[in-house]
């Protein structure tokens, strides 16, 4: 029996933000998200710290002199939720900047609310 992919759920502007990135980044993130839909984890997907488990993952790609990130969650049984797609602009370290972490937390809450509503 063939595995059925989970649907992707785009929170807020994530799809528009992803499609505005360089084509090589869009392809790489698309591949990682496709793997997540089938219950697999892309080799370049890493758990995002501060979330306590491997349920919130981040994929990082470099292109055109910039660093791009996509954050998604596989915590919910009904779908893969894409929480944030952005270009990292901080010049200090590799940590995800606080404003982006705040966006991720807020969108994770929205995904949780949506998933709860889908189960009712």
Label the predicted regions.
Residues 74-82:
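Active-site beta-strand-loop-beta-strand hairpin of nuclease catalytic cores
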Residues 70-72:
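Hydrophobic/aromatic beta-strand elements that line small-molecule binding cavities or substrate pockets
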